[in-house]
From Swiss-Prot:
SUPFAM superfamilies, per database record: S-adenosyl-L-methionine-dependent methyltransferases
GO CC, any one term: cytoplasm
Reactions it catalyzes: adenosine(1518)/adenosine(1519) in 16S rRNA + 4 S-adenosyl-L-methionine = N(6)-dimethyladenosine(1518)/N(6)-dimethyladenosine(1519) in 16S rRNA + 4 S-adenosyl-L-homocysteine + 4 H(+)
Protein name: Ribosomal RNA small subunit methyltransferase A
Tree of life domain: Bacteria
Species name: Rickettsia felis (strain ATCC VR-1525 / URRWXCal2) (Rickettsia azadi)
Key words of the record: Cytoplasm, Methyltransferase, RNA-binding, rRNA processing, S-adenosyl-L-methionine, Transferase
Protein family (similarity comment): Belongs to the class I-like SAM-binding methyltransferase superfamily. rRNA adenine N(6)-methyltransferase family. RsmA subfamily.
Enzyme Commission number(s): 2.1.1.182
Subcellular location field: Cytoplasm
Lineage of origin: Bacteria, Pseudomonadati, Pseudomonadota, Alphaproteobacteria, Rickettsiales
PANTHER family recorded: DIMETHYLADENOSINE TRANSFERASE, DIMETHYLADENOSINE TRANSFERASE-RELATED
Annotated binding of S-adenosyl-L-methionine, by residue: N23, I25, G50, E72, D97, N116
Primary localization class, coarse: cytoplasm
GO MF annotation list: 16S rRNA (adenine(1518)-N(6)/adenine(1519)-N(6))-dimethyltransferase activity; RNA binding
Amino acid sequence: MLPSIAKHAASHQINPLKKHGQNFIFDSSLCDKIVRASNLAENSRVLEIGPGTGGLTRSILQKNPASLTVIETDERCIPLLNEIKEYYPNLNIIKQDALKINLTDLGYDKVTIISNLPYHIGTELVIRWLKEARLITNMTLMLQKEVVERICAMPSTKAYGRLSVICQLITKVEKCFDVAPTAFYPPPKVYSAIVKLIPLENPPSIALINKVEQITKLAFAGRRKMIKSSLKNLVPNIH
């Protein structure tokens, strides 16, 4: 039988490292709540980024997925994850930087993504995955609350911006619940939140997504600039 999440981490002397953006979750009930929010079906293929000490990993595995692939860059966590694998042979462990891996590299036809994302790369990962939306069943992600609010923001609100446009162009977005800093070790300085993104049945082409990404980057470059002025770099003859 596996020890508790906290005891398992302590047995491997794993302390959070700032360079990896690590804030560990030792509360198994919170991990279970995140997985419930995903509506994970049995026999799904699942991807988790940054499993760390394996709390969310355990909760996912308890739902009997066909496979769970975890991508972890911190070599200290690999022996701990291998011990979890002894109980769950359907766990696949990849030691790699998540930014260096595309979903197509993993051979998925469809995958469900459930992750407590490292906040310093979370937005970049979301944008990359949106371009591979045809391979994704849904994504249930923990991010900074501010980022989740921007993903879900409606037009004419202060939070509405580039991330809102791109995410809502490709997926149906739903904020699930907030997570207080006290849920983590060490507690971060900001609140977190869980967001669920479900790709639309007919997502736009990658070419269109790239164009929208380019336009919105310019359009929202400065809140005080006129959009016309911002877009002149992209469309020189705009009037």
